[in-house]
Amino acid sequence: MDDTITIALCCIAKDENPYFEEWLNHYKNIGFDKFIIYDNNSSPSIIRYFTDNNISTKNITIINWTDEEFGSQSRAYLDCCQKYSDFNYIAFFDLDEFYMSKSMNVKEDLKSLDYPDGLGIYWRIYGKS
C-alpha cells in the first residue's frame, strides 16, 4: 500500500444535532478525510441544522435514512461500505465516541500498525457526563 491513506467516518444519528460540531472538529483534526452521516429522521434534519448553524458541509455527505426496520444501523453501515469502498478505511463512531491515541493522528496510527485489514478499538468510559 502506498503512503497515501484515505479514511472515511460513518455514523447514523437521530436527534443528536448539538453534538455534531465537536465530533466533526475532533475527527477532522486527527486526519479523517470524509464524513458520511445517515440521518435517521432527526428533527430538525441534520442538513437543516448544519445550514441554520453555518456548519460547513465540505467533505460531508448526509444521507436521509428513514429505515424503521430493526437493524437500521447495520443496514446503514452496509450501505456506507458499499457506496464508499474507494476509501482505504471506513471507521464507525457514534457521536458520543471519540478516537484517542498518543499520536492523535489516525493515519500515523494505521501506518504504525503496518496497515491492518481491520482494527477493533476498545471502549474506555470516563464516568458520568
Regions found by a protein language model. Name each.
Residues 11-25, 41:
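Active-site beta-to-alpha loop of glycosyltransferases that engages the nucleotide-sugar donor
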Residues 33-41, 63-66:
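Short beta-strand/loop segment that forms part of the nucleotide-sugar
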Residues 40, 94-98:
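Short acidic donor-binding/metal-coordinating loop in glycosyltransferase active sites
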Residues 101-127:
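Conserved donor-nucleotide/metal-binding helix-loop-beta segment in metal-dependent transferases, i.e.
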Residues 6-8:
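Cell-envelope/extracellular polymer assembly enzymes that use nucleotide-activated donors
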Residues 33-34, 88, 117:
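Short acidic/polar active-site loop segments enriched in Thr and Asp
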Residues 25-34:
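Short, acidic, metal-binding catalytic loop of nucleotide-sugar glycosyltransferases
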Residues 45-92, 100-101:
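Active-site-proximal specificity loops/subdomain of glycosyltransferases
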